[in-house]
Amino acid sequence: MSSTWSPTVRRRMFCLLLAGGLTLGVAACGSGSGESTGGKVKITVTGQPPTSQPFERGVFDADVKEFEESHPDIDIEPHEGFMDPKTFSAKLAGGQLEDVYYVYFTDPAQIIARRQAADITEAAKGLKNFGDIKPELLDNFRDADGKLYGLPTMNYSMGLVYSRPLFQKAGLDPNKPPQTWDEVRAAAKKIAALGNGTVGYADYSKNNQGGWHLTAWLYSMGSEVARKDGDKWVAAFDNDKAKAALNQLRAMRWEDDTMGSKQLLEAQDVQRMMGAGQLGMYMAAPDNVPVLVKQFNGKYEDYGVAGMPGGQGTLLGGEGYMINPKASPEKIKAGLEWVRWKYLNPERFEKHVQQYVDGKQPVGLPAEPTPDVWQGAVRDQQLAIKAKHANVPAENYQSYVDSSSRIKGSIEPPNAQQVYAILDSVMQAVLTDRNANIDQQLSSAVSKVNSVLAQVK
């Protein structure tokens, strides 16, 4: 990986920069390359990893070749840049938007409202294994009438990443991670008591990452950040649950002194602490674990991932693909078949996992190459293949896997990045000012968030 951030955090930065770029109407969307070449349907697709990620690029290019061999009537023209905010808006404005394009889970609602994606409701019905995809993920790509505009290919939910060695040193059972925030607080006390600068629990509080994590905290307590009130969105976090979350954070920071003195942290700061063996726990998705190993000299066996403490909810995110609204029926059909074959294909589970094993990449995490987008028998099939080929201690993440089916996941609020910027200030106040007035912080944030939500169309 070329970045010290996990894919989850890199997607956050992409969305932050993209937030102002999805404001163009359907007239700005082109149809990509020509309709056909030599009798073939030619489609342009995003998702090709950059050359700085040689393993991922190699897998993608090999998949394109295999797909074209098995689908001689379809010609794939792959494009890099699916995470490049510098080109996304320009492509929309210049009519160069690909036929099949990547989106983050926060994007579909606005894209659909602005008619920047094709209606694939009927075309998707014939896709193999369509009924095995988790319906709550598909719902993220539907409009108010239930019409479908995209397919999910990867998802994550926030949980708790923790240091198994520090748990053991502190007399805690690493196979029984905290399930409530009170248990997190108690564990943080024992870990911080180890001394030598050891921090029990850390959290983000700048560059919108603080607001992102505060949203996850609120979900875990059973609160919302925004709710629909008739035809408009309104803030929904000036409540006792939000106050309880912030009071818990304040208590850990100031009463317990388990969060360290250095604050205004972001992802790479916290990952560096965990990789150095100086941090007990932090909130994150499972894709953080490979980053800790590859970029911060960690070991897979040293980390566990638990479900979101509190169990009343968690932040759900992910990615998927949508189709250019000007694409012909032939291109829509070809594009959906590419997405299904490449990303949503149980028949290729074993081969895809083997690609990772052969490339000495981690297998066993609840993340790529086995994204948790399936339900029922197909999910069981995927879990069995993952267990068969696991080259990392999958049992360390079992708590997270077990909780994923019972903890409700909620996607991010509308205009998420603007909301997060406001909530950053709340996190910063609580973590840097012992006397911060939580009621005032929430009241002020609600007023500002309502102004942001009023812009949602």
Residue ranges and their predicted role:
Residues 121-134, 177-179, 200-205, 223-244, ...:
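Short, solvent-exposed loop/beta-turn-alpha elements that line the ligand-binding surface or hinge
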Residues 2-8, 12-110, 128, 174, ...:
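Conserved N-terminal structural module of periplasmic/extracytoplasmic solute-binding proteins
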Residues 144-153, 158, 168, 182-234, ...:
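Extracytoplasmic/periplasmic solute-binding protein
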Residues 292-298, 311-315, 322-421:
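C-terminal lobe and pocket-closing loops
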